[in-house]
From Swiss-Prot:
Bias (Pro residues): 365-381
Superkingdom of origin organism: Eukaryota
Name of the encoding gene: Tex44
Classification lineage: Eukaryota, Metazoa, Chordata, Craniata, Vertebrata
InterPro entries referenced in this protein's UniProt entry, alphabetically: DUF4678
Protein name in UniProt: Testis-expressed protein 44
Region annotated Disordered, chain positions: 1-85, 207-233, 256-290, 305-384
Keywords for this protein: Cytoplasm, Phosphoprotein
Length: 530
């Protein structure tokens, strides 16, 4: 705006420069014409000019020269002033343009730097936010994957432990049940066979003791009062029933072999009984024979002999009376047959009971043993003497098998008792329960093992089957768990790959968007900066 008005002074100055040159030429011509030396003298004045007017002409000529000199001086001064003014104005314009260009460049640089700083900050913030979001997504995905994998592993381990525990519990229960059944069946069968073998001897002893229990003063007590004898029998028919257990041909053959071996053995007591029966031809076969007191005393133990001597009734009471055991024995047989008819499922027991058997059936404990007697034997009373007379001592040889072993030796010592006969079948049953289990002992005899350790170490077919089933089930379960774990890891790997791929795609798209956005803004701000 300041440059346009300055052009007119330059044009005027140029015109003025041109004008003084022309004017100077004119003035020079005039001066040269007016100079006195060069000008014409008075003689050269025109002829028509009067002499009086010469002074006036000279004066005018001087005035013209003076005015011209003044005009020249004025023009020179004006030209110098204009040149100075033009120089100053040009200097001011250059300085102003330089300052304006410097300020403009500074402003452009500052604006460009600010724009670049904002763009870089936006880029950094966007990249940081993108990286943060991607890191959060990756962390969340990894945590979720780890949590799901841990839960799957925990559930699989819990299910594995539960199934294994159930399998082990079921196997242990089955093994324990089978072992218990295998042990209980031989014990019940052995108890039954022992009871069947011992019961005839007990019935014979009780029948004989019933004959001997009769007092000499009352010869026909069994015939006159049969109800008193039957009152000693147990009223509950289920007491005498014996559980035969599960039938097994192996145990039946063992029982038959035992009975055969017993029947082959002949004891001294049997030979003495046969000789006494032959010596008394009037006594019918199958009935007990009364042994004289001397013979009985010779066969009884020492403490029984002393008690017999002390409790022997006087001979005056028994000299005129003969005992009649035959009617009493016949009545006892009739009562036994009647009891069998009433209880066909049970084995008949002899109606004649000893004092110990009646005490055992009624639940009354027997008399305590006398501490003064040797071996803890019961007190010597007439009842004990009569029971001793009525019982036949059991010979251990009858129960001795063909082949000796530890189990049968212990049974022989139990049956023999070292001093006298067994008291009842309860002793055998209690021994079979409290000892090392009758089933194990019979199993040892049947299998031919030398000791229980051999039988325990020998693994039966049922145990082997259960073990093989457990092994196969465990292998199948482990293979299933491994395959399930492999598939789970495979799916987790695929999930991680997909998450990583999506993350990289998101990063690329974000970078493309930022690059496109920033380049467009730079393209818009470029022309304005220039």
């Amino acid at each position: 705006m300041t440059a346009e008005p300055l052009e007119d002074p330059e044009a005027s100055s140029s015109s003025t420069h041109d004008l003084p040159e022309a004017s100077s030429d004119n003035t020079a011509d005039e001066n040269s014409a007016d100079l006195p030396g060069e000008s014409e003298g008075p003689d050269s004045l025109p002829d028509d000019v009067p002499p009086g007017d010469i002074d006036e002409v000279l004066a005018e000529h001087d005035v013209d020269q003076t005015s011209e000199a003044k005009a020249i001086t004025t023009e020179q001064n004006e030209e110098q002033d204009f040149i100075r003014t033009d120089t100053f104005m040009r200097q001011d314009e250059d300085l102003l343009s330089k300052q304006i260009s410097t300020i403009t460049e500074k402003n452009v640089d500052q604006a460009y730097m600010q724009i670049n700083t904002v763009f870089e900050q936006d880029k950094d913030q966007a990249s940081i936010q993108t990286a943060t979001l991607m890191g959060q997504d990756e962390d969340q995905a990894f945590l979720q994957i780890v949590t799901s994998v841990g839960q799957n592993k925990d559930q699989a381990s819990i299910q594995t432990a539960t199934l294994m525990g159930q399998d082990e519990d079921q196997a242990s229960l089955q093994i324990a049940t089978s072992v218990g059944q295998n042990k209980d069946q031989p014990s019940m069968q052995m108890d039954t066979s022992i009871g069947q073998d011992v019961e005839p001897a007990i019935s014979t002893d009780t029948a004989t003791s019933a004959v001997k229990d009769e007092s000499p003063d009352i010869p026909h007590q069994g015939q006159d009062n049969p109800e008193e004898t039957t009152s000693l029998l147990p009223q509950d028919p289920g007491i005498l029933q014996v559980f035969v257990g599960f039938q097994n041909p192996v145990w039946d053959r063992l029982a038959e072999n035992n009975r055969t071996s017993r029947s082959r053995t002949v004891s001294p007591s049997d030979s003495q009984t046969q000789e006494k029966t032959l010596g008394n031809p009037n006594v019918p076969e199958g009935q007990p024979v009364l042994v004289p007191n001397a013979d009985v005393l010779s066969n009884l133990p020492e403490h029984v002999q002393t008690s017999v001597g002390a409790a022997d009734p006087p001979p005056s009471d028994t000299s005129g009376r003969d005992p009649e055991p035959t009617p009493t024995t016949n009545s006892a047989k009739q009562e036994a047959e009647g009891f069998k008819a009433l209880n066909p499922g049970s084995k008949a027991r002899s109606p004649g009971l000893t004092s110990e058997d009646s005490a055992a059936d009624s639940g009354i404990p027997p008399d305590p043993p006398d501490p003064g007697s040797p071996g803890g034997s019961p007190p010597h009373s007439p009842d004990f003497y009569q029971v001793a007379l009525g019982r036949n001592l059991l010979d251990p040889n009858l129960y001795r098998p063909d082949v000796e072993n530890d189990y049968m030796r212990s049974m022989t010592s139990l049956l023999g008792c070292g001093e006298g006969s067994i008291s009842s079948l309860t002793d055998i049953l209690v021994w079979s329960d409290t000892a090392t289990r009758m089933g194990v002992a019979v199993g040892i005899l049947a299998s031919g093992c030398s000791s229980p350790a051999d039988r325990l170490q020998d693994e039966g077919p049922r145990l082997r089957t259960v073990a093989s089933l457990l092994r196969s089930a465990r292998s199948a379960f482990s293979s299933g768990v491994m395959s399930g774990t492999g598939s789970a890891l495979h799916s987790v790997t695929h999930l991680l790959e997909s998450v990583e791929r999506r993350t990289m795609e998101g990063i690329r798209s974000a970078m493309r968007y930022l690059a496109h956005h920033l380049t467009s803004r730079w393209a818009r701000t470029g022309p304005s900066g220039n």
